[in-house]
């Protein structure tokens, strides 16, 4: 997720965090 957070550096990062949590649910 480091690469994702690297690209998402701004306001959208907060929204993307929710998307990342969804990925973690599928990957974990």
Swiss-Prot record:
Enzyme Commission number(s): 3.2.2.22
EC class (word): hydrolase
GO MF term set: carbohydrate binding; rRNA N-glycosylase activity; toxin activity
A single BP term in Gene Ontology: negative regulation of translation
InterPro entries per record: Ribosome-inact_prot_sf
Keyword Methyltransferase: no
Superkingdom assignment: Eukaryota
Keywords: Disulfide bond, Hydrolase, Lectin, Protein synthesis inhibitor, Toxin
Reaction it catalyzes: Endohydrolysis of the N-glycosidic bond at one specific adenosine on the 28S rRNA
Keyword presence, Secreted: no
Protein purpose: Gal / GalNAc-specific lectin. Agglutinates both native and trypsin-treated rabbit erythrocytes but not human erythrocytes irrespective of blood group type.
Family designation: Belongs to the ribosome-inactivating protein family.
Subunit field text: Disulfide-linked heterodimer of A and B chains.
Protein name: N-acetyl-D-galactosamine-binding lectin subunit A
């Amino acid at each position: 997720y480091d690469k994702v957070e690297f690209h998402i550096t701004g306001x959208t990062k907060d929204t993307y965090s929710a998307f990342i949590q969804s990925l973690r649910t599928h990957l974990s």
